[in-house]
Regions:
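Residue-level signal for tight coil/turn positions that link beta-strands
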Residues: 31-32, 133, 140-141
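Conserved hydrophobic "DFG−1" position in protein kinase catalytic cores
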Residues: 29, 89, 137-138
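Catalytic-loop of the protein kinase fold
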Residues: 118-138
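ATP-binding glycine-rich loop module of kinase domains
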Residues: 3-75, 98-100
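C-lobe/activation-segment region of protein kinase-like
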Residues: 139-241
């Protein structure tokens, strides 16, 4: 977890072939870890945006006790450029693979654990505005947040946590419900809590999930124990007519 200064990008001895090509970087696999190499236009440290990115990523790399954030490790620079950084390999899949057999209780546990790590980001005055489906991975037991390139300094610690928490919450609810519209429920309590979360007035994410499960169970007169149970009830249009 350090800044490593090299003379040029050749010193990194990158593999001949990249593993992935993203819009602003290339990903390589080397020695059991990923190397993310920034595009040339995003490297110059004389550019304030690139310099700030280096500073934020350095601060993130120094965080301790993190389990569910795939943070940068070594940051590689030259005299004039921020070349990129190494990062651990995460074997999770996108949240689209959130299977129907997973229990609601496990979803709640995974969300709570990831939120604890997200709170550690906000506590050091950093906001990650890039929490979306491609950056949250799932491996049956845990959720992981990846890709911190767009993180910024943010003075309001409480607001930073609410912004990140709301983004994660909406993503999880969307995947749990398989994109079914919550308006189908037409429930005052559900709509009220959802609105407060979206307006950054509340962090009742877990309470919402539990209430949603309870409301669907009452409406369907069935036990709602898994993601599949919830989706099956939502597919039953007769319940919502």
């Amino acid at each position: 977890m350090a800044i490593v200064k090299v003379k040029s990008i050749e010193d990194l001895r990158l593999p001949d072939k990249e593993l992935m090509i993203w819009s602003r970087s290339k990903i390589y696999y080397k020695n059991g870890e990923y190397l993310k190499i920034l595009n040339i236009c995003d490297r110059l440290l004389s550019d304030g945006t690139n310099y700030n990115r280096l500073q934020v990523l350095e601060k993130l790399s120094e965080l301790n006790g993190i389990k569910y954030l795939e943070l940068p490790q070594n940051l590689y620079i030259t005299d004039k450029e921020f070349l990129g950084y190494s990062m651990p390999i995460c074997l999770g899949k996108p949240l689209d693979y959130l299977t129907e057999d997973i229990s609601i209780n496990k979803v709640i546990k995974m969300v709570m654990e990831l939120l604890e790590d997200i709170q550690k980001i906000s506590a050091i005055g950093i906001l990650n505005p890039d929490i979306w489906g491609g950056n949250v991975l799932f491996d049956k037991n845990n959720l992981y947040l990846i890709d911190f390139d767009n993180c910024i300094y943010f003075d309001d610690i409480d607001l930073a946590y609410k912004v990140m928490g709301m983004s994660l919450f909406n993503l999880i609810i969307d995947r749990m419900l398989d994109s079914y519209d919550l308006n189908w429920l037409n429930d005052i309590d559900i709509n009220y809590i959802k609105e407060r979360i979206d307006n950054l007035e509340s962090t009742d994410y877990i309470a919402f999930i539990n209430l949603l499960r309870l409301k669907i169970a009452r409406k369907s007169q069935e036990k709602i124990e898994t993601v599949g149970d919830m989706r099956r009830c939502l597919r039953n249009e007769k319940l919502w007519q």
